[in-house]
């Protein structure tokens, strides 16, 4: 049986699934180690500057394609950071994301991943993931989110910013999958709970990997 099935597989709304304890401790450690190693290299973790000149509160690593925080578009090089090519998306990470999509009833072959490293004071305001291609958005290709490290208070709303939101706790090893009719729902992170992650991961804070199909 795939991880995430059975009692730990919760449908939040049609098209959105919380797969609790989806990743094994060994998988969490392997993902954290790989992301930290990639993030320490050239074209590694950076602090994006958004429109208006304000830095985001997370550090970001883009794999497969780079997300430009000033233009809200994807590109092959980090033109808003250092001009370096975006690192490739490791096949083993892509396979894990495809497996999670299957566990939630979707099919996905991701070609990019955004890794956000949350510190104790990091937040992410309500937003839609809508910068992928028109074809991808129209098809409802899901976003696959993995949480590694400290727990996060997560909001999942509707198709309008002012719609009611559901409040969830995402813990280390959880996957959250949203696609189909829920693909463009607003979501965000209001709080990180320091010290709640597994002690053996080798870092502080929370790594959030979101896999997409451009």
Model features per residue range: what roles?
Residues 1-214:
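Non-heme Fe(II) oxygenase metal-center motifs and adjacent flexible, charged/small-residue loops
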